[in-house]
Amino acid sequence: MKARNAVLVDGVRSPFARGGRGKLEATRLDEVGALLIKELLRRNPQVEPTMIEDCGIGHGGSQYDVAGLGNITRLAGLPVEVTNFMTDRQCGSSMETAQRVAMGIMLGSYDCGLSVGVERMGRTMGAGMGGGPK
């Protein structure tokens, strides 16, 4: 079996701010991830949401609000058929998910996938619990 080429089409970056009481402190991680997906789809109208078959979600750390990150695809409006997986590789989570999605494409498991990374270093497990995932 010959491996197919995987192509990175586009990338977006979430905003960042000061830790602690910065402007994004109250912003939920699942909402940040959903905004990234929505922006990618807006910038690439040739990619229909139904074309996406898998979404890798990387997070660095053990924040309480990563428990429902699988909902990112639903909050972004992707079809329920889009599968997703989560990876915690500390500082390498987003790269790990990008590699796994690329491998899936190269091996023919699917044709189109997304990789998303979200983290909040200012609010780790046990630091001001509350406001979990949607």
Task: Walk through the language-model features, giving the residues of each.
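Conserved catalytic cysteine-centered active-site region
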Residues: 59-112
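Terminal domain-initiation and capping elements
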Residues: 1-2, 29, 36, 44-45, ...
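Short glycine-rich phosphate-binding loop at a beta-alpha junction
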Residues: 50-58
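Active-site pocket-shaping loop/turn-to-helix segments
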Residues: 16-38, 61-62, 85-99, 122
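Phosphate/pyrophosphate-binding loops at sites that engage ATP/ADP/AMP, CoA/4′-phosphopantetheine
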Residues: 39-51
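Short acidic, glycine/serine/threonine-rich loops at helix termini
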Residues: 19-21, 66-67, 123-130
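N-terminal amphipathic/basic leader segments beginning at the initiator methionine
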Residues: 1-17
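Flexible glycine-/small-residue-enriched beta->alpha junction loops
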Residues: 111-134
